[in-house]
UniProtKB/Swiss-Prot annotation:
It holds the Pfam family RBFA. Keywords: Cytoplasm, Ribosome biogenesis. One of its GO terms (cellular component) is cytosol. The lineage of its organism: Bacteria, Pseudomonadati, Bacteroidota, Flavobacteriia, Flavobacteriales. It comes from Flavobacterium johnsoniae (strain ATCC 17061 / DSM 2064 / JCM 8514 / BCRC 14874 / CCUG 350202 / NBRC 14942 / NCIMB 11054 / UW101). Monomer. Binds 30S ribosomal subunits, but not 50S ribosomal subunits or 70S ribosomes. One of its GO terms (molecular function) is ribosomal small subunit binding. Belongs to the RbfA family. Disulfide bonds: none annotated. This is Ribosome-binding factor A. Signal peptide: none annotated.
Amino acid sequence: METNRQKKIGSVIQKDLVDILQGEVRKNGVSNLVISVSKVSVTSDLSVATVYLSIFPQEKAKETLEGIKSNTTLIKHDLSQRVRLQLRRVPNLVFFIDDSLDYIEKIDNALAGKENPIENRDLLDKRRKS
């Protein structure tokens, strides 16, 4: 269970990370790429922030995530410059791809199909935790 402080820090980080990532996409002249930060969860000791990204189009998601992971220190520095008046110490950032939209789409497609996935549980993949 997240405390109010964790939620507030997560929302501050989320808002500023969106600006940083979208600014880098625009600055590098990459077209047809949308990066959104769907969720940021902060550990109880405020040392690690887990960032879930939705990247569209899905085909560029893995390579974009690798680029973001390789530039984590620069992103953290930019973030610390933006939130220096709100946070004493910026948590370490860990990035993951948010696959919840894909999972929801698979469920919708399975429910619209001929066989019922509620009766036959083998139709849907097990969701993996990241």
